[in-house]
Swiss-Prot record:
InterPro entries the UniProt entry points to: TEX47-like
UniProt protein name: Testis-expressed protein 47
Gene name of this polypeptide: TEX47
Highest rank taxon of the organism: Eukaryota
PANTHER family to which the protein is assigned, alphabetical: TESTIS-EXPRESSED PROTEIN 47
Matching Pfam families: TEX47 (PF24787)
Gene source species: Homo sapiens (Human)
Expressing tissues: Testis-specific.
Length: 253
């Protein structure tokens, strides 16, 4: 398409090109604006994803477990700058599986809070917590909010694979199933919904991890508890020995 512009003789007025250029700029709708705003908000800090397992007392109210985490998340974000926590908490009869997504500093504070309760209380209702894996600098969240689901599947319907598989096979099944479940929930749940609720074993029974695997990982010595991880986290990478103190000071690369 071409445009012909006729100037009057002797006229020095600039051509009205601004309206033409303005029409060529794509306009974004309000939804696109909100999505871009959310994307920029989530990029304030580098995001990490952490997988935790732990045992809980059989007589503890499932609501108490969920309330503990909700109140703790609010307290951490109130006193420390960081990203909001999103993820999934599966509460089994005697154990929990927790997937958390947030900034590293926020996840660090979550572990410290658990350590504080274990030290200060005679018997804390969450016990034998183990860190299975931490993924650093993840490109995006799988969960846009934090969800809780109580699993009420009878043990008799779940096969105990821990008796016939090696630790490598068990952890492979654990990571595979949890990632499949996370992707499924990411694709099916919309922002603002309450989440899967307590019927997850009916909605996605094939993606549900047997409780025996969680309890098996809680007892495994190959995985760190929060206290051991925090001690390693705070330990300096390079330790200077007395024999290394020379002048000029050596440089490390």
């Amino acid at each position: 398409m071409s445009f012909s512009v006729h100037n009057q003789k002797g006229s020095k007025r600039p051509l009205p090109l601004e309206p033409l250029l303005f029409l060529q700029v794509p306009r974004s709708n309000y939804l696109h604006f909100q999505e871009e705003k959310q994307r920029l908000h989530l990029k304030k800090f580098l995001l990490d994803r952490m997988f935790l397992v732990a045992k809980i007392q059989a007589n503890v109210e499932r609501k108490d477990v969920a309330d503990y985490y909700e109140q703790m998340f609010q307290s951490v974000l109130k006193h420390h700058l960081g990203e909001a926590v999103t993820g999934l908490l599966l509460i089994y009869p005697t154990s929990i599986l927790h997937i958390l997504e947030s900034s590293s500093d926020t996840l660090y504070k979550v572990l410290l809070d658990y350590i504080g309760h274990v030290k200060d209380e005679t018997v804390f209702f969450i016990q034998q917590m183990k860190i299975i894996v931490i993924s650093h600098n993840i490109p995006m969240r799988l969960f846009m909010q934090w969800h809780v689901s109580v699993i009420k599947v009878p043990v008799m319907y779940l096969d105990d694979v821990t008796q016939s598989q090696s630790l490598k096979e068990v952890i492979t099944d654990f990571l595979t199933q949890t990632h499949k479940l996370s992707l499924y929930l990411c694709q099916t749940m919309k922002v603002g919904t309450k989440g899967p609720g307590d019927n997850l074993h009916q909605v996605a029974p094939d993606l549900l991890l047997p409780e025996q695997i969680i309890k098996y990982l809680c007892k495994s010595e190959e995985f760190m508890d929060p206290a051991t991880f925090i001690n390693m986290y705070n330990r300096p990478i390079h330790i200077t020995l007395d024999s290394e103190v020379v002048w000029p000071a050596p440089s490390r690369f």
